[in-house]
Design a protein with these regions (language model features):
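Conserved hydrophobic/aromatic beta-strand scaffold that supports enzyme active sites
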Residues: 31, 126-128, 196-198
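Glycine/small-residue-rich phosphate/adenosyl-binding loop
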Residues: 2, 68, 74-152
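A glycine-rich helix N-cap at a beta->alpha junction
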Residues: 92-100, 185-208
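Generic N-terminal amphipathic, Lys/Arg-enriched alpha-helix
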Residues: 7-14, 27-44
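Conserved, non-catalytic sequence blocks in retroelement Pol enzymes and Pol-derived host proteins
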Residues: 47
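Small-aliphatic-rich amphipathic alpha-helix that forms the alpha element of a beta-alpha
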Residues: 35, 54-59, 127, 133-184
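Glycine-rich phosphate/pyrophosphate-binding beta-alpha loops
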Residues: 59-66
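C-terminal helix-cap and adjacent tail motif
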Residues: 2-24, 114, 195-208
């Protein structure tokens, strides 16, 4: 079978001088070095368009076969946030009391974490990253995605960087298992919850 002609478009690329490259690299490094994980959030509202712009940045991530196998679910409804917190705390109580090996609990001890997750309700936004195993095309045919976890993880990293660049604090949360997120958010079984990102402004008393 003859090879298909690649569908490409002309690259628009901005070439920088060495001094510009150094300046940009240092400025971005200085910005990202100030990123911190936050567990105490203010309920202060965040403009939705800021989050949407960060989603757009995340969508520029490379992906296997350019399939972009991810879905970002944005949650602000207090009722849904409450359901997520309740379900997450059920799993976390199991984790801390039965599932976690002692060395993992020892590693967590200096952070002071436990099964209580008030930040899941306090923060204005929760973002659930779903990795999509398949896509359904315009004809209704199911097509397999490739390098799904790797692709969705790269997009998640860009999202966290974009949120920090926008002046927002984040927390990555991974209760295990996370299938309850599919149920609460009505996502199909072909999508696997990869991460829950808590997003907003830090509380005044926040520490890291």
């Amino acid at each position: 079978m003859a090879a298909q002609t690649p569908k490409t478009i002309e690259l628009a690329f901005e070439e920088l001088s060495e001094s510009q490259m150094r300046a940009r690299a240092l400025d971005f490094n200085n910005l990202m070095q100030r990123r911190r994980t936050v567990r105490d959030f203010s309920s202060r509202e965040v403009p939705r368009e800021v989050i949407n712009a960060c989603f757009s940045t995340a969508g520029s991530a490379p992906s296997g076969a350019n399939r972009q196998p991810w879905h970002f679910a944005l949650i602000s409804d207090p009722t849904i946030k409450r359901k997520i917190r309740e379900a997450a705390e059920v799993e976390e109580k199991e984790f801390y009391s039965r599932r976690a090996p002692q060395d993992w609990l020892d590693a967590l001890a200096p952070l002071g974490t436990d099964s209580e997750k008030p930040f899941l309700e306090d923060a204005p936004f929760l973002i659930v990253v779903f990795a999509q195993k398949f896509i359904v095309d315009a004809e209704g045919d199911k097509q397999k995605n490739y390098y799904v976890t790797e692709s969705a993880s790269i997009a998640t990293g860009l999202l966290i960087a974009a949120l920090h660049n926008a002046g927002l604090a984040t927390l990555t949360h991974t209760p295990s298992p996370m299938k309850f997120l599919n149920t609460i958010l009505g996502r199909p079984s072909t999508e696997k919850p990869l991460m829950l990102i808590v997003c907003g402004n830090p509380a005044k008393q926040a520490r890291y």
